[in-house]
């Protein structure tokens, strides 16, 4: 964009995930959980699925360290036209940190919903590859048939919005050096989503247990 075109490429890509995984073990585990919810990794084995090729073809994520570093270096070069390099690196590092923190909340929420699938409380839609949340079905959280019949999973919808809307706002706002927006419309909403998901899951488990009796 600094050269006058409208190309918008970043180190973290559209999906906010990357390979290789971060060095921090907890963050790496959280990113793996998110990759499973994107359908890029098999939730049971952790192995890549065919959807990884779709992500590659659409260039939705940086999948090598070199690709990630190339985009980060471009950004630093742009920032240093007005700011010192140390300031630019510090600000970009803050963006990385809020993503790490957001991923902790995101992974916890995914695991809560995945547990409902695992225990049969949420039924796997026929066209889902796995009994697991699937973000790349977008708003069709009951699968194509469920969307047609309006039989969608509400807790999945909240989880999807947490990922696609509030997580993105949290880290993208930091990369735009807008901490106020990142907090109010990103981080605060992420914590709200997680609380709502936990409460809904508790209710769903209680209802399911009562139904079984």
Residue locations for each model-derived region?
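Primarily the internal scaffold of c-type cytochrome electron-transfer domains
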Residues: 1-208
